[in-house]
């Protein structure tokens, strides 16, 4: 009985430590997001923070390695430079830029590197207003070809969904931009690496849209993606745990 109680205490301590690590990881992601939003506020107001972009900073991140606090997947559009719109400096954010902010295995590999190997607690999927890639997809007739066609194919589902919802041309464009961001989120969540980090509470994912007109970044509501453990799997795991506990009690 004494050993059984001791095992129970150890298990309780383990649960507390695990929960504490999840809370810490969650707060790290929240803090990283707040840093981005604070930076965007400075950008919009034109009150930029002083940044060391000289020799000392370059030497620091060369010798000490990179330690960015966020990974961002954004569009290649020259009007959407994440470092500027979030008022960040050298080594602050790990960025993956692709036209239309879509992802393929190569882009996903870069994202995985940022969240798993560079250990950023935050991943932001950033779309933007008046996106040329989405516009081009809306105007495409027939089967898209070539390398640009590969981008168009990734965006087409969002455009089709937006057209079904209806509205003016501008409204359809804006809806398609948001739908595309959500589709990218779903694609990112197919990554086993990303899924595991989210499940373990080590990674926070957010989706957002940058407004080219006013410079503001608007946070969007995440869609529900089934990345959690299936209920049947969860029940099986619970049963296995209970059996293991009973065997331990009998042994003692």
Predicted ranges, named:
Residues 74-79, 99-102, 128-129:
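Short glycine-enriched loops at secondary-structure junctions
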Residues 125:
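Conserved functional hotspot residues or short segments at active or partner-binding sites
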Residues 1-11:
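Bacterial N-terminal signal peptides that target proteins for export
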């Amino acid at each position: 009985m004494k050993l059984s109680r001791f095992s129970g205490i150890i298990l309780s301590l383990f649960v507390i430590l695990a929960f504490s690590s999840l809370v810490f990881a969650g707060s790290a992601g929240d803090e990283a997001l707040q840093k981005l939003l604070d930076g965007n506020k400075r950008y919009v107001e034109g009150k930029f923070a002083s940044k060391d972009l000289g020799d000392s900073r370059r030497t620091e991140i060369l010798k000490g390695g990179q330690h960015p606090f966020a990974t961002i997947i954004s569009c290649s559009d020259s009007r959407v430079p994440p470092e500027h719109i979030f008022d960040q400096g050298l080594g602050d954010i790990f960025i993956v830029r692709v036209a239309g902010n879509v992802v393929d295995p190569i882009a996903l590999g870069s994202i995985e590197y940022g969240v798993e190997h560079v250990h950023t607690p935050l991943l932001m999927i950033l779309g933007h207003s008046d996106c040329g890639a989405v516009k081009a997809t809306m105007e495409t007739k027939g089967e898209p070809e070539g390398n640009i066609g590969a981008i168009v194919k990734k965006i087409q589902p969002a455009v089709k969904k937006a057209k079904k919802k209806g509205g003016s041309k501008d409204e359809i464009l804006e809806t398609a931009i948001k739908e595309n961001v959500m589709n990218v989120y779903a694609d990112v969540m197919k990554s086993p690496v990303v899924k595991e980090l989210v499940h373990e509470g080590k990674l926070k994912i957010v989706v957002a849209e940058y407004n080219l007109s006013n410079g503001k970044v608007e946070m969007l509501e995440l869609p529900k993606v089934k990345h959690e453990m299936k209920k049947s799997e969860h029940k099986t795991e619970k049963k296995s745990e209970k059996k293991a506990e009973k065997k331990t009690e009998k042994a003692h």
